[in-house]
Amino acid sequence: MKRNILCTAVCLLALVACAEQDGPLHPGDNDQRTLQEALLVAEPGAVIELAAGRFELDATLSLDVEGVTLRGQGMDETILDFAGQAPGTGGEGVLVTANDFTVESLAVENTLGDGIKVEGTTGAAFRSVRVEWTNGPDTNNGAYGLYPVQVTNVLIEDSQVRGASDAGIYVGQSANVVVRRNEVWENVAGIEIENTTGADVYENRAHDNTGGLLVFSLPELPVKDGRDARVYDNDIADNNLPNFGKEGAIVSTIPAGSGVIVMASDNVELFGNRIHNNQNSNLAVISYLSTGRTYNDPGYDPYTEGVYVHDNEFVGGGDMPNGAFADAFVALAGGAFPDIVWDGVVNPDKLVDGAVPDELRLYVENNGDADFVNLDLGSVFAGGEPSVTTDLGPHQGSLPAVPRPVDLGAATGAGSP
């Protein structure tokens, strides 16, 4: 037995040594074994380079070695094809549980579950990566394309995701995050920042999704509440795709035609964005209570507080309202939803002399001729009649700028913003 183990180890080391001598790993007769063995025997800090071509894979590739870079020759040149992935062989395409991981210049296609998942680590960088379900929008597609969860120091840049049945780019329960210069389309949610602290989301294109960009905090998760997000200089347009999310998932309730939704997150600044032609609403600021979903989480804060919306460009949109409260309120809102829709729900326990403290308010200014509605759902939830108003007067003013996340240039594997 010892001799067999020794022989196996020698063979694996020889395989990697040959790969290093011969250059990048090339597609061959058993791509699953070749790539998984390379990941298993990689030394900390190793660069695993893949040649151009299509690697045919039938199970999850897993990595638990720190500081590894997985590098292809371009997102349209090096393709990890999981079309042959069988149930029971792992849901993800690539699963990483090690610090300081970088993946760049390759594509992941047609996974059963998530495209690339990094979980419970420090330092994760995704550069010039494409994740795609090539059949287009389908409820049976994997949930997430690029999926860091419970990660500190995340960089996602210059990447593309299409066809995710939940979110194309999903950053969950994480801290110190930069998401920039990506394109997401034909997903249920294009980009979702969830229960995360310190996120810069900028220069992205989110188009032709059900919802373009979401900043959420959800209950019943290990990491509570999200805050300190800056969303700026993004193009968020034409997110009118019918919702194809899996039943029961929170995103399955997102109305088609949603540009940006901020829900239950605090201290969020949105500025310099171009938000165009999202048929339900260009921007919605809501509490979790407005979803109508119940939860059992005493530590959860369902209210959205401290949101500053300024210097954005709003065009079109709001002409086909739908979703939970559209029928009841669209007539009161003038037959269409304005550019900015606020549910009007505030935490009654935080009122001071009947008013919301300045630092917890919604402020809206310098958005051109953007219009606004307060649906006053707080009165509805209290058993009264709503006093719907389009008056922006109470929302004039500003909040301090949200601080940018930590400089990721100091974090191995996470680049420089």
Range-by-range predicted roles:
Residues 1-7:
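Bacterial N-terminal signal peptides that target proteins for export
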Residues 15-17:
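C-terminal motif of bacterial Sec signal peptides marking the signal peptidase cleavage site
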Residues 19-21:
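Bacterial signal peptide processing site
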Residues 26-33, 47, 67-112, 135:
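Right-handed parallel beta-helix/beta-spiral solenoid domain characteristic of secreted/periplasmic
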Residues 35-42, 56-65, 70, 117-120, ...:
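Short, T/G/N/S-enriched strand-turn elements that build extracellular solenoid repeat scaffolds
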Residues 58, 82-95, 110-117, 138-148, ...:
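Extracellular beta-strand/beta-solenoid scaffold signature
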Residues 73-76, 99-110, 122-135, 152-165, ...:
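Right-handed parallel beta-helix
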Residues 291, 295-417:
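Acidic, glycine- and Ser/Thr-rich low-complexity intrinsically disordered tracts
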